[in-house]
Amino acid sequence: MAWIQIRLNSTNEKAEQMSDFLEEIGSVSVTFMDSQDTPIFEPLPGETRLWGNTDVIALFDAETDMAEIVRLLKEAKHLDSNTAYKIGTNRRLKNWEREWMDNFHPMQFGKRLWICPSWRDVPDENAVNVMLDPGLAFGTGTHPTTALCLEWLDGLDLKDKSVIDFGCGSGILAIAALKLGAKSAVGIDIDPQAILASRNNAEQNGVTDRLQLFLSDEKPSDLKADVVVANILAGPLKELYPIISQLVKPNGDLGLSGILETQAQSVCDTYTQTFALEPVAAREEWCRITGKLKTL
C-alpha cells in the first residue's frame, strides 16, 4: 500500500496532543522517535515515554491532500513557524508485522537463558526457555537495554527470591526471573495492553500462579521484593528514585536500564545515596546500573 509520511519535530509536552490530532484528521498510524531516530516503545509507570526532543511521524493514505493536513495542523496551532516538518512520498508500506516475525529468532542471554518466539522451536530443550509473544507491548530482548537486564538476571541466584519488574511491558523480565528460579514476581505498568501481554506470556510459560500484575496506580503500597529491575529511561529513573528505592528489601538487588552511557553518572549520583553500586555495564551506547541496598 502506498502512503505519505509527515514528520514533525515536537516536544515532550506537545507530542501526545499532536498525535491525537493527527489521528483525528485521518492518520492511519502515528509513532514517536527521539532525535537519534530511536523508536519510543512504551509508556512508563506514571507518564509517557518521550525524550525532550521528539519527532512525531504520521502515515496517511497516498491520496491524502497533504496541503490540507498542513493547513489543519496550523489552524489547530500544532504547526507554527518554529515547528520543523518534512513530508515524504512514493514509498511503500511494508508488512512490518510479518517482517518482524520472520526476523525474530531465539536469542541466548547469559549462560542459561533463552528467549524464544512462541512460533519457533526452542534450540535447547534443557535450557531455561522463555516463550514470548510480545503483542503490542515492548520487550523482546532485541533492544540492548532488555538484553542487559536479562543477562543480569541470568547471573543472579534467584532461588526463592521475590522480584519486581517495574515497567513490565511484555513481562519478559518478570517471566525470565521466575523461570530462572524466583519464587514470585510482580509486574507493574501504566498500560493495560502491557498487563494483557504479560498475562498472556505468563500463561504461555506456565507461571501465572507466581506472577502478579498491577497497573501502576493499583500496586500495593507496602510492596517490596528481593530483586527490583526497572528498564525505563534516565529521567524517570531519577524522578522515581523515592518510589523505586522503597521497593527493594534490605540487602536486596537493584537493576536499572534504559539509560544512555552519557546519562549514567547522573543516575548513579541519584541512587548511590542508598545503594552500593557496581561497575556500569554498557552496550551500543546504552548501559545498565546495578547495586545492593545499603544496610544501616
UniProtKB/Swiss-Prot annotation:
Enzyme Commission code(s) on record: 2.1.1.-
Coiled coil ranges: none
GO molecular function terms noted in the UniProt entry: protein-lysine N-methyltransferase activity
Function, as annotated: Methylates ribosomal protein L11.
UniProt-listed NCBIfam families: prmA
Similarity field: Belongs to the methyltransferase superfamily. PrmA family.
Full protein name: Ribosomal protein L11 methyltransferase
Organism: Haemophilus influenzae (strain ATCC 51907 / DSM 11121 / KW20 / Rd)
Gene behind this protein: prmA
